[in-house]
């Protein structure tokens, strides 16, 4: 059997790659690379993840930098990366940040007219 191209392989959902708040980027890079290689060996073509929800979600420059480390590692390993917001459902709320300055923008319901 031929090995499918990475674009046809499934992505593994990982709700932020957990790490201690004081992790050094080089250590994180090695952990991420090891995780990606393990996933690739198990038939995954990449990951679906988000900025860590553990440490000042979406407002931490450090967390964005660590997400960039993951993105660079995915590129280096030839794997795909999907990024989404995740801190409560429904998705899109960004942990309350979406509506922080505009609470009237919240959807009140969903209607299907056929």
Model-predicted segments: where are they?
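Conserved, charged catalytic cores of large soluble enzymes
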Residues: 7, 41-55
């Amino acid at each position: 059997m031929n090995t499918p191209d990475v674009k046809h392989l499934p992505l593994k959902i990982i709700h932020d790659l957990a790490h201690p708040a004081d992790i050094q980027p080089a250590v994180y890079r090695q952990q991420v690379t090891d995780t990606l290689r393990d996933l690739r060996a198990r038939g995954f073509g990449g990951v679906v993840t988000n900025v860590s929800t553990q440490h000042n979600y979406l407002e931490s420059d450090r967390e964005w930098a660590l997400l960039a480390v993951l993105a660079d590692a995915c590129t280096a390993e030839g794997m795909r990366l999907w990024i989404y917001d995740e801190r409560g459902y429904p998705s899109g709320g960004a942990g309350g940040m979406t509506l922080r300055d505009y609470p009237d923008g919240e959807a009140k319901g969903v209607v299907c007219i056929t």
